[in-house]
Amino acid sequence: METRYTHSPADIRHYSTEQLRDEFLVEKVFIPGAISLTYTHNDRMIFGGVTPTTEELEIILDKELGVDYFLERRELGVINIGGPGFIEIDGAKETMKKQDGYYIGKETKHVRFSSENPDNPAKFYISCVPAHHKYPNVKISIDEITPMETGDPLTLNQRKIYQYIHPNVCESCQLQMGYTILEPGSAWNTMPCHTHERRMEAYVYFDMEEDTRIFHMMGKPDETKHLVMSNEQAAISPSWSIHSGVGTSNYSFIWAMCGENITYTDMDMVAMDQLK
């Protein structure tokens, strides 16, 4: 597991492209047959990919977290963006097709991941945050979620937002997690943009062609910067930063947030004339 530290807006004012990428971009999220995780000190979120092939995988981080087992004091969100697979939670095994999700509460002792076909492995994207209360484990299917439809073809930002871990779907301590799909012909996400000082966020972009690129916008509204990202890469968004993106073609992304509250609409909108 890689550790990333926090930064003030003043810290990144003079960062080079390489420095910015080193601090906020995760280039390899899904590694076949392996677990690839990042621990960010922004609200102590752990996120990354679990990509089982021939053998099942289990996240073991007791020493790193100073606990007896991974979810002793944490809650976990999972969404599969790859081939069909399985998740086993304290001995109970469930199938997980593409776009299936799971909320797993604190004090769950074992979570094991496996794939149905090693040649088409499941790709489990996970987000894990500190938790103070144990809530029930809930399997979540995209078919059961009524998407929030937003944007407009004229502004190139028409998209569907599927809220997986959200008060309308399941209980959680502070984790929110969802899946956004852009409509054909749209390129922008989260524009007009916003910040939310009370929550950090992490994005992973996927379902992209090899030569498609995302220009992920970040920074204070009056001093923006960007990361150029390719398929299945992730970005860390501190609470003070905008988080928006535009693609050279279609894409999807998973977002995950944690912080002071679980109010999805608690955000500070940024007027277009404030952007620089």
Curated annotation (Swiss-Prot):
**InterPro entries from the xrefs?**
KduI (IPR007045), KduI/IolB_isomerase (IPR021120), KduI_N (IPR027449), RmlC-like_jellyroll (IPR014710), RmlC_Cupin_sf (IPR011051)
Q: What highest taxon heads this organism's lineage?
A: Bacteria
Q: In which pathway does it act?
A: Glycan metabolism; pectin degradation; 2-dehydro-3-deoxy-D-gluconate from pectin: step 4/5
Q: Name the Enzyme Commission number(s) assigned to this protein.
A: 5.3.1.17
The processes (GO biological process) annotated in the record are: D-galacturonate catabolic process; D-glucuronate catabolic process; pectin catabolic process
Which GO terms fall under molecular function for this chain's record?
Answer: 4-deoxy-L-threo-5-hexosulose-uronate ketol-isomerase activity; zinc ion binding
- Which reaction is recorded as catalysed by this protein? 5-dehydro-4-deoxy-D-glucuronate = 3-deoxy-D-glycero-2,5-hexodiulosonate
Binding-site positions, Zn(2+): 194, 196, 201, 243
* Function statement: Catalyzes the isomerization of 5-dehydro-4-deoxy-D-glucuronate to 3-deoxy-D-glycero-2,5-hexodiulosonate.
PANTHER family named in the record: 4-DEOXY-L-THREO-5-HEXOSULOSE-URONATE KETOL-ISOMERASE
Question: What's the protein called, per UniProt?
Answer: 4-deoxy-L-threo-5-hexosulose-uronate ketol-isomerase 1
Which gene does this sequence derive from?
Answer: kduI1
